[in-house]
């Protein structure tokens, strides 16, 4: 009974309808410079635009398209908006003649709030449920509360609060400066309508027929070309080598460049950009990009990075894992400064946070204790892109390891030192750590009150595991050459998590590469050498380790793995007689496979693992874990227009 009462903490937590977004660090627009496709030593935005011009997308014989004429606007008469005023998100987020049941319900709740003069500063989920009862709004799927709350934010009128007018997308929508129009005219010349449209169409068509890397267009994967040194980062593979709910809709169906275009030219957005726009308008903190000094240039660079990642997604799903120096996304992601986090991030957290922040993706909503004036705490709902797990701050034993499973998943806390949501199981004692505000919202009987979960997930749930033992002393291996020590404390990672009656399966994991050998699980080496990814495909766990192509020992280990996988196919999963086969009938296959690996080509089946091998590696070396619903189930629970 105690658990049921305490679980109401989630329902009565402050929903945070009032916007706290502040963007006072950058100027509106650079009055002295228009970004072009000419390479420049002084402007990183111009450099990235020049790379987009040089990109040779799939042409497929498409006719060059003409840009539609823009509506004439009296930009000269428009005055800059005051910094302290508010603008209704619904004015910005209107779409071309389409609506959904979810959006209509949000309108009804917002109208009820304004008619009855509700104080939105103290609005809670319980208040919303009470209003839904009065309005006869029935929502059986708990996940829909996540989206409904967002729509309530977006449909409140000007008397309530939605978004600060200093948000760059609102400034573009309101045409706050004539220079914005001048810059977008130049962008239209740079982004070839044919090439960009083909890139969008190709990735969206791929998405329709893609499940994971076992359904790639070509199962013969190319890891490297002689003239290239860059490769698709394992974190990108973990996010896009398998189709993840919600993230797929934001990155593949949504497009930042066309979003900017539509906001400025038509003051409306197409349906495929709607959820991307709402994600962006409801983000808590802006990002700052090193070397970019104004808001509009930041949005342009954001659109450039979205396009670069889209091209990487297209290549991943075609089995092309190498890229030219100009196409590498990692250096751009490392230049993003996350103003909501007060600590220096490790390389892998920086890349993960940057990829998600480009589209404002925050799929997890949790109830956490937030300090007030340093003397008390208030329960607030916090949207988070990922949950942080720090084994070095947890005291564990062999009898009580860190466990990520259906029982412990409900324990979250807020780390005031870094501004992040952390995983804090009650049996670990995380609450005594500095800066961490831990209040168990479920009492003791967690499993008995699982239906009252203080966690709502929109499609995917991500964990970042901090294993670097000296993160705060050194950082940035790729720039300083320093080798981090990795804490290989085993974590009990469950392949499945039941949350709110929905099954979330472990879809992918990024692990630290410690030993020199490709499959050396028992290595005593504790120094970081890179990362690799394990995807849980329809054909079993599959490993992506791009660094193995640079190491002869790793190539030999991969060759042995490929040969054993081939022999298991022929012998019905038996290892008996492998070496006799290798010296006899399998010698020709071994020679051809060795030649393939020397040419940096591998088949999908070559890198398949057993479930035991995969979970053993993940337990000791994982740094990123991604759980998600099955994509088909995610789609079937929603109306088609709600997906975008």
From Swiss-Prot:
InterPro entries according to UniProt: P4B
Annotated compartments: Virion
Modification comment: The 73-kDa precursor is cleaved to a mature protein of 60 kDa during virion maturation. Proteolytic cleavage of major core proteins OPG129, OPG136, and OPG098, which occurs at a late stage of core formation, is required for production of infectious mature virions (MV).
Cellular component GO terms, alphabetical: virion component
Principal location: virion
Propeptide: 1-61
UniProtKB keywords: Virion
Cited function: Major component of the virion core that undergoes proteolytic processing during the immature virion (IV) to mature virion (MV) transition. Essential for the formation of a structurally normal core.
Similarity comment: Belongs to the orthopoxvirus OPG129 family.
Protein name listed in UniProt: Major core protein OPG129
Annotated organism of origin: Vaccinia virus (strain Copenhagen)
């Amino acid at each position: 009974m105690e658990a049921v009462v305490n679980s109401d903490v989630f329902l009565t937590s402050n929903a945070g309808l009032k916007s706290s977004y502040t963007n006072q660090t950058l100027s509106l627009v650079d009055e002295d410079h228009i970004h072009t496709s000419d390479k420049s030593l002084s402007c990183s935005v111009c450099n990235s635009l020049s790379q987009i011009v040089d990109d040779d997308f799939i042409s497929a014989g498409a006719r060059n398209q003409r840009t539609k004429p823009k509506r004439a606007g009296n930009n000269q008469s428009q005055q800059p908006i005051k910094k302290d005023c508010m603008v209704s998100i619904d004015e910005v987020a209107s779409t071309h003649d389409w609506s959904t049941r979810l959006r209509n319900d949000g309108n009804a709740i917002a109208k009820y709030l304004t008619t009855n003069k509700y104080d939105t500063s103290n609005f809670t989920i319980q208040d919303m449920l009470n209003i839904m009862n009065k309005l006869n709004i029935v929502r059986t799927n708990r996940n829909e509360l996540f989206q409904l709350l967002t729509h309530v934010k977006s449909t409140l009128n000007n008397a309530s609060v939605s978004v600060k007018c200093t948000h760059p997308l609102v400034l573009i929508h309101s045409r706050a400066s004539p220079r914005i129009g001048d810059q977008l005219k130049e962008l239209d010349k740079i982004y070839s309508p044919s090439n960009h449209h083909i890139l969008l169409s190709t990735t969206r068509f791929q998405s329709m027929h893609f499940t994971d890397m076992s359904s790639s267009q070509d199962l013969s994967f190319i890891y490297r070309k002689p003239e290239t040194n860059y490769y698709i980062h394992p974190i990108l593979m973990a996010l896009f080598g398998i189709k993840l709910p919600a993230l797929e809709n934001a990155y593949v169906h949504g497009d930042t460049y066309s979003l900017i275009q539509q906001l400025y030219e038509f003051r409306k957005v197409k349906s495929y950009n709607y959820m991307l726009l709402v994600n962006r308008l409801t983000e808590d903190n802006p990002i700052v990009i090193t070397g970019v000094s104004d808001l509009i240039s930041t949005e342009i660079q954001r659109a450039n990075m979205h396009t670069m990642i889209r091209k990487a997604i297209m290549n991943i799903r075609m089995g092309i894992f190498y890229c030219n120096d100009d196409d590498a996304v990692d250096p751009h992601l490392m230049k993003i400064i996350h103003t909501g986090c007060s600590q220096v991030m490790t390389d892998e957290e920086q890349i993960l946070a940057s990829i998600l922040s480009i589209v404002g993706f925050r799929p997890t909503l949790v109830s956490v204790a937030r300090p007030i004036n340093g003397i008390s705490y208030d329960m607030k709902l916090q949207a988070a892109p990922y949950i942080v797990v720090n084994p070095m701050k947890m005291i564990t034993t062999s009898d009580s390891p860190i466990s990520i499973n259906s029982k412990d998943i409900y324990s979250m806390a807020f780390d005031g030192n870094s501004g992040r949501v952390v995983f804090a199981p009650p049996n670990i004692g995380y609450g005594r750590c500095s800066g961490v505000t831990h209040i168990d919202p479920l009492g003791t009987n967690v499993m008995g009150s699982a239906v009252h979960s203080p966690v709502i997930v929109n499609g995917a749930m991500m964990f970042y595991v901090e294993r670097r033992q000296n993160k705060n002393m050194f950082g940035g291996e790729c720039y300083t050459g320093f080798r981090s020590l990795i804490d290989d404390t085993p974590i009990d990672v469950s392949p499945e998590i039941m949350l709110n009656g929905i099954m979330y399966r472990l879809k992918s994991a990024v692990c630290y590469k410690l030993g020199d050998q490709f499959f050396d699980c028992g290595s005593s080496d504790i120094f970081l050498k890179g990362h690799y990814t394990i995807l849980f495909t329809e054909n079993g766990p599959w490993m992506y380790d791009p660094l193995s192509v640079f190491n002869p020992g790793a190539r030999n280990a991969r060759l042995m793995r490929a040969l054993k996988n081939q022999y298991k196919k022929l012998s019905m999963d038996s290892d008996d007689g492998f070496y006799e086969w290798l010296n006899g009938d399998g010698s020709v296959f071994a020679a051809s496979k060795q030649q393939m690996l020397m040419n940096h080509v591998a088949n999908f089946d070559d890198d398949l693992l057993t479930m035991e091998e995969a979970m053993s590696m993940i337990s000791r070396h994982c740094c990123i874990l991604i759980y998600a619903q099955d994509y088909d189930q995610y789609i079937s629970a929603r109306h088609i227009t709600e997906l975008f």
